[in-house]
A protein has these predicted regions:
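Conserved acetyl-CoA-binding loop-helix of GNAT-fold acetyltransferases
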Residues: 100, 106-119
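Helix-loop element at the rim of GNAT/NAT acetyltransferase active sites that forms part
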Residues: 32, 43-55
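Conserved beta-strand in the GNAT
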Residues: 72, 78-87, 92-94, 99
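Conserved active-site tyrosine of GNAT-family acetyltransferases
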Residues: 138
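A short helix-loop-beta-strand connector motif used in the catalytic cores of GNAT acetyltransferases and
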Residues: 61-72
Length: 155
């Protein structure tokens, strides 16, 4: 988490209000991420073969510190999933990254993270790019295919 304590407290308050409308799986808590969660984010990302958090950790950490919403799902003390979004707060929220530990899938954690993002900004649409293996999950959450996504990476 960045050093802006006021912003962190505001995010916690916003999330508390949003979570009043979210059904959480048993034993799962969703909270605002902190820098201490970054190694767990790297672990889960690595298991998905996502290179940025491990090959470019400084850039990835910076992205997490400057994104909102940036949430983790925890079971006890263990981070079992995360979502990082980017929003204008009015029209669109882009889900930049979301992953659930493979051993924890099927419990409703991903849906709860997406619902938390939605209820933080209930008038925005949620946009994302999906890998083929996750399409059925997103469709079950109410998403629809709209266009073919594209990406150009510089590293």
């Amino acid at each position: 988490m960045n050093n802006n304590t006021d912003m962190y407290e505001e995010w916690k308050w916003q999330l508390t209000k949003a979570l009043e409308q979210v059904t959480l799986p048993q034993g799962i808590e969703i909270r605002v991420w902190t820098d201490a969660d970054f190694s767990a984010i790297q672990r889960i990302s690595s298991a998905e073969d996502w290179p940025s958090p491990t090959r470019r950790p400084d850039d990835s950490l910076f992205a997490w510190q400057h994104s909102w919403p940036a949430l983790v799902a925890v079971d006890g003390e263990t981070v079992v999933g995360f979502v990082r979004g980017i929003t204008d707060g009015a029209i669109t929220m882009f889900i930049a990254e979301m992953a659930i530990d493979a051993q924890q899938r099927g419990r409703g954690i991903g849906r709860a993270l997406l619902d938390a993002c939605h209820f933080l900004y209930p008038t925005t649409r949620l946009d994302l790019l999906s890998v083929d293996d996750a399409r059925d999950f997103y469709k079950a959450c109410g998403f629809r295919t709209i266009h073919q996504g594209m990406r150009k990476s510089y590293m």
